[in-house]
């Protein structure tokens, strides 16, 4: 059965935080959804942890990215995604419990091809989430040049429809990260 949700993550040297993030995502996935973990060869125990999760959860697929770098690693993850909705994830985040459900509702209500949501910043201390959002009060304004100069796109806060996938691939290697590329591409091709 084809997944409705694909969560994609680029992973490198992430053993310190990755378990907590994987658990926060897996708690929200159905049995038919998928979590794509694309990794570059790490110097720590990251690959071992990924393989452990792959054995324990049928939603998890681990794919190696032979090209080094975050852009190539995210591209590899997105290429392997099969879901109708693709969520980007960083390896050191923790997802709030209703993130996927709220984003799905937003897709259905708006018909948007790409959505962005708020985020909170936390430090290494347990329970250290600030009560003020990092993006609160920042309005995303129209205009490609403005987006290029001051990015309003943050991959950890981004989800998009499968229909955008063919437009964003391949992700160019260059001055912009994958999330800026995806956001600008969505803006160019918006309905």
Specify the residue positions occupied by each region the protein language model found.
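Cell-envelope/extracellular polymer assembly enzymes that use nucleotide-activated donors
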Residues: 3-6, 34, 181
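Short, well-formed alpha-helical segments that are part of the catalytic scaffolds
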Residues: 14-27
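A conserved acidic beta->alpha catalytic loop
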Residues: 24, 39-48
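Short beta-strand/loop segment that forms part of the nucleotide-sugar
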Residues: 33-41, 63-65
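Glycine-rich, basic loop-to-helix element that forms the pyrophosphate-binding segment
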Residues: 65-81
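Short aromatic/hydrophobic "clamp" motif used to bind/position activated sugar donors
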Residues: 86
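Conserved donor NDP-sugar-binding/catalytic core segment of glycosyltransferases
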Residues: 100-129
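Conserved nucleotide-sugar donor-binding catalytic segment
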Residues: 143-191
């Amino acid at each position: 059965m084809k997944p409705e949700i694909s969560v994609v993550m680029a992973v490198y040297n992430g053993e310190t935080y990755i378990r907590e993030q994987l658990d926060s995502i897996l708690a929200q996935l159905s049995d038919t959804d998928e979590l794509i973990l694309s990794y570059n060869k790490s110097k720590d125990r990251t690959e071992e942890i990924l393989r452990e999760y792959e054995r324990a959860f049928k939603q998890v697929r681990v794919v190696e990215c032979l090209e080094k770098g975050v852009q190539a690693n995210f591209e590899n993850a997105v290429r392997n995604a099969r879901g109708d909705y693709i969520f980007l994830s960083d390896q050191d985040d923790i997802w709030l419990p209703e993130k996927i459900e709220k984003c799905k509702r937003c897709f259905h209500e708006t018909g948007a091809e790409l959505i962005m949501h708020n985020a909170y910043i936390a430090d290494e201390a347990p329970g250290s989430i600030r009560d003020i959002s990092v993006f609160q009060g920042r309005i995303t304004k129209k205009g490609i040049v403005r987006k290029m100069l001051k990015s309003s796109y943050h991959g950890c806060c981004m989800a998009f429809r499968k229909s955008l996938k063919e437009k964003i691939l391949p992700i160019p290697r260059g001055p912009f990260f994958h999330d800026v590329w995806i956001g600008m591409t969505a803006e160019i091709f918006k309905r």
